Amino acid sequence: MKKTFFTKDPSFYRSFFKLMTVIALQNLVAYSVNMLDNIMLGSYSQNALSGAATVNQIYFIVNQIALAIGNALIAISSQYWGSHQTKPIRKVTKAALLFSLAIAAGIIALCIRIPNTLIGLFTTSPDIIREGTTYLHIIQWTFLFFMISNLLLAMLRSVETVKIAFLISVISLLVNGGINYILIFGRFGAPEMGIRGAAIGTFAARILELGIVLFYVWKKDTKVKLFDEKFRDGIIGKGSGTVWKTFFKVCIPILTSGLLWAVSLPMQTAILGHLSADAIAANSVSSTFFQYLKVIVIAIAGASAVVIGKDIGSNGEEKVRCNGRTLSVLYLAIGLLLGTVLFLLRSPLLSMYRLTPQATLYADHFMIIMSVIMVGMSYQMPVGVGIIQGGGDTKFSMYLNLISVWCIVMPLSFLAAFYWKLPVELVVIAVQSDQIFKCLPIFLRFKSYKWIHKLTAID
């Protein structure tokens, strides 16, 4: 193709923005499901809310594992989609499913054998542990359903089928919210079940999600046709070595990176939790609005991984470079827009809360900081995860996260909070600093184009 700095292909923009919009809506609905659970349990009982929150720490780890395996599947499958091959997609999807099932089984076994020990990692309160154990007893089975659903939806996303995921998220929100309302509070003649009712609502929603996605993949999907052959074909026996080697080569670095980040979050929360009560309240409020805008950034990264992988699979390296440059500039523009929105809306948003004057001042300062952080995150996350990792270079992201989070951010945050005892605004900057300084190494790696890795070795 003729060398140009930015792509002029309208189909590229249509594909990218379609994927981004649907993924963003799906993520927004999924985030709202968690918010709804917290609101309902919070209005029922503080111990119930805290018990569910501790179990959600375990679910967060499961979620990160599922996302990592799904991202690995997308990185590989999108390249085959670009080269119009679907048989290898079926093989690598089945490998990812088997790996996910093994991990889910291991986590569920731990939840059955040592539930109190697991929950005790996050709290020492006997009342909260009791509520959390009740919740975990039901929720643990949803880990399996969630991992299967997530993998099948990742497979569909890799071939640019995304609307079904949004539909499932909406149905899940309605079902979960409805059952929660009835069973938590005992409405319409149902027994008042408290935290058990919330767990049953989540269980029912996850079962329904899995049922819908299985039906869609089996009966409606005309692209991959996952069930057109025996499940063992290609992943057990002759020729299966290449499938597993390719999958683990991509998956292990992504999984390691995700787990390193997931483990760091509770530690960052603990650092912020040692600040004053006003600072903790301010951080909670500002983080809520920040997370809603972050949903858009995550969607951008997800859409980018699909379009870049598809371009690599079609053997158009110059096209990959051109589209990558176009996307990187789009990221900056979107980041500036999101940062400006957060900055301008901070006063109207804060007016909805009843905070102390000091907490309001802190929240205002935090949202100004988050406005700048948003610009950096809107660039580094989509380039790092969407383009570089989506292009097959998974080890770079792993090493970058290892160094930035564990060698810089965590020590810096600890020193800022406990040794130097800096103002709370500077502590928040330290905790979020990787969103800014990762931009430089990510930009340099992107400009080298060494992230373009061909992953299509499966027959």
What role is predicted for each listed range?
Residues I23, N27, N38-I39, A75, ...:
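Transmembrane alpha-helix boundary and packing residues in multipass membrane permease domains
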Residues G70, I139-S158, A165-N176, A198-L214, ...:
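Short runs within selected transmembrane alpha-helices of multi-pass transporters and secretion channels
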Residues A30, N34-D37, L41, N63-G70, ...:
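Alpha-helical transmembrane segments and their lipid-water interface positions
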Residues L28, S32-S50, I119-P126, I182-M193, ...:
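Helix-terminus/linker motif at the lipid-water interface of multi-pass membrane proteins
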Residues L49-A109, F146-A165, T269, I280-R346, ...:
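Small-residue-rich hydrophobic transmembrane alpha-helices
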Residues K18-D37, I138, S149, S172, ...:
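Transmembrane helical elements of multi-pass membrane transporters/channels
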Residues M1-I23, S77-L144, P191-C251, I308-M374, ...:
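Short alpha-helical transmembrane segments in multi-pass integral membrane proteins
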Residues L41-F60, P126-E131, I195-R196, T242-V250, ...:
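Interfacial/gating helices of multi-pass transporter permease domains
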